[in-house]
Amino acid sequence: QRQMCIRDSYITYARNGMDMKAVLPSYIIRMIKKMFPLVKEYAREDTFAEHAYIRIPKADIVWSEGNLNKVLAEGIALELYGRELTGSVTSFEQFASCQFAYFCQYGLGLKEREEYQFAVNDFGTILHAVIEDVSKNIKQNNKSFVLLSDEERSQMVSESINAIAENYGNTILKDSSRNEYLIQRMKNYADRTLWAIGKQLADGIFRPDAFEKGFLTQIEELPHDVLFYMKGKIDRIDVCEDDENLYVKVVDYKTGQSDFNLLKTYYGLKIQLLTYMREAMIYEKKKYGDKNIIPAGLLYYNIQDPIVEAKKDDDEVEALIRKELRMKGVVNSNKNIISMMDSTEGSSVNIPVSYTHLTLPTICSV
């Protein structure tokens, strides 16, 4: 006769989801109840650890491990990270989000095994590369986003994406019909993005000054002669000027949905736009030393090719598309600066600003 090695077996399930709304248990729970009708079911009482998790600093570690880990010894930390630390904005956000995840990724160097496939991250990487390539081409040839014809823009996008796809991952993008479809989809996204950039710039007087502007800045000196650097790339810096001031707008391209969140910024979870603005202002001050450098906007452009429903004409379709492509983020509350970014009236289709009947801007401001 077989004997069980454990006295009791427990199966648990959540009563509430992440949004604290009630959720139904898995169908497996119902099956077990039918198979074992004598199984007892009860709600676990709140434990001290649950209260401690909410009320006591670092209690989450106590709850999950039962002990507080010691800080790495100096020698081990130096062996892992070295005396010169270089981190991206993403790595800073990772540390603020989960220090253990940061340790695994940047200390131990752990990562998922690479597979021969075209992943979601690759889609965004190629789109960024195409937008950068075409944007620099426009600037180097003294062309204008605003005046670029649809045919010329589409041709530049096709040439750029074909060249990048040919050299990407040993032609991984050419090995299936699905990936060929993705190439066409990326062309549509890139073309729509560059079209939107032209429309948005046409409504104001800001003009692109730099694309994919890299930076490497020493943050501070740490104990034991450790140096700390932050690196990154700013997707786009737009500027405009008057007699005394230079106004700076930072735009970051995202393939997902992103918006400025003050609470996450405060806790270090989303510091990208603020960091980019700081570096952009330093960069522009070196070029325009005699002017005051004024931040105008921190904006995300979410890359997409929206489909809209319209019953009237092409103008209505364009207006709806531009509304879907409106940038998100925060802008300077100065009305004159806002009009430099968008001189149109009413609710802007370019930036997160709308005007009331008293002609006062309703905005997200910095």
Q: Which residue stretches match the model-derived regions?
A:
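Short, small-residue-biased leader/transition segments that mark boundaries at the very start
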Residues: R2-I6, T359-I363
